[in-house]
């Protein structure tokens, strides 16, 4: 029984609600039919996409967004992180429809083909002004709406002591795993890096906010030394735990906006860094599709076909993801070792599922040659040396 596991945690919350109030909450969801999905693997990658990104006649249209993603990214990307989704604005109709019911219907098209990730932003003003019962109900509702991953930002618990925050996260993680054993609580934490590891006790995945800044600096300087040293300091997560890696997040500008001259080669090399690291990689739709504001689906498809720059970025990122999906050493749980090769090259060794990969990314505009051999994952050819042109990358399988 879930209550036997939850009661000790709820008692530690010092919440104003009674035990009967909490029991009624879980009784409310007892009749729901829950669907779990596959455990995360090398097949797992996330597209961060604004729920308002695609429009029809200037109005947000989840159906049009679904069609776009189903037709153009489903074969390469497994998960959608739908941001700006709550509260949901339904399309006007002649009949009054409960927005929650309409959202469930709208999202049903997505979770037949993608795993879904939503954000949870607790309505917290200080330790005393928070309704944990109501927030927990909202958390469970996201699971009922198809989420297999829920992102929670620690800083949204304004004024709440860290110990109590961890009790809330412990409660939500237990609820998530009860309803969806393969689900993941994704924690966004931008505090002291030395304290990040302590949150693995109450989360399955922790966001790497520092990756973007270290990657930007590496390309700006043409030197991977700082990026290499940072990555080498990352603690290996425990069993069943991993990281959430991204070059830009919903709260910030797209990665390429911070580059002086973001060439196609530079953007693809940056994504090689992203996909090389242990964890679940997340791609920003603004970078993948080359958009910054809502756009009509037909216009977006036409622009992707006719704009060489956007098409090369789009197809290049998906090409990397397609290779990643076929190698178990890219599992988010596969081992990682940072290798020092050349100061201009970021090098990662990944091992898992009986294979070892060496992943090289040139962050400079120099030509670099490294003494290494293996099978090039993109061409299938054996190479006796790693030859990297400006902003080039090569992924090798060791024999």
Walk through the language-model features, giving the residues of each.
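Active-site and adjacent substrate-binding regions of carbohydrate-active enzymes
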Residues: 1-373, 379-399
């Amino acid at each position: 029984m879930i209550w036997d596991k939850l009661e000790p945690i709820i008692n530690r919350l010092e919440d104003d609600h009674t035990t009967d109030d909490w029991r009624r909450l879980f009784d409310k969801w007892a009749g729901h039919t829950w669907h779990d999905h596959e455990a995360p693997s090398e097949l797992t990658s996330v597209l961060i996409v604004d729920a308002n990104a695609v429009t029809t006649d200037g109005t947000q249209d989840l159906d049009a967004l679904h069609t776009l993603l189903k037709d153009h990214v489903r074969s390469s990307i497994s998960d959608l992180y739908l941001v700006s989704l709550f509260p949901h604005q339904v399309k006007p109709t002649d009949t009054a429809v409960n927005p929650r019911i309409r959202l469930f219907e709208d999202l049903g098209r997505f979770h037949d083909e993608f795993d879904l990730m939503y954000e949870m932003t607790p309505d917290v003003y200080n330790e005393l002004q928070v309704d944990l019962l109501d927030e927990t109900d909202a958390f469970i509702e996201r699971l009922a709406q198809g989420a297999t991953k829920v992102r929670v930002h620690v800083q949204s618990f304004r004024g709440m002591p860290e110990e109590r925050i961890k009790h809330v996260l412990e409660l939500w993680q237990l609820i998530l795993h009860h309803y969806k054993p393969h689900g993941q609580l994704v924690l966004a934490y931008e505090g002291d890096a030395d304290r990040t590891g302590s949150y693995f006790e109450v989360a399955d995945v922790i966001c790497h906010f520092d990756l973007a800044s270290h990657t930007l600096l590496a390309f700006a300087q043409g030197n991977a030394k700082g990026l290499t040293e940072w990555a080498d300091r990352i603690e290996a997560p425990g069993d069943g735990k991993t990281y959430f890696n991204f070059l830009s997040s919903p709260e910030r500008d797209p990665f390429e906006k911070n580059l002086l001259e973001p060439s196609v080669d530079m953007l693809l090399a940056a994504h090689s860094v992203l996909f090389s690291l242990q964890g679940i990689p997340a791609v920003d739709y603004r970078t993948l599709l080359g958009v910054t504001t809502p756009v009509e689906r037909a216009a977006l498809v036409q622009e992707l076909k006719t704009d060489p720059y956007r098409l090369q970025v789009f197809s290049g990122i998906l090409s990397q993801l397609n290779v990643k999906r076929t190698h178990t050493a890219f599992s988010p749980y596969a081992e990682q070792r940072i290798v020092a090769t050349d100061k201009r090259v970021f090098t990662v060794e990944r091992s898992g599922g009986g294979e070892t990969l060496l992943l090289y990314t040139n962050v400079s505009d120099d030509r670099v040659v490294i003494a290494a051999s293996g099978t090039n994952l993109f061409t299938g050819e054996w190479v006796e040396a790693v030859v990297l042109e400006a902003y080039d990358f090569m992924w090798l399988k060791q024999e």
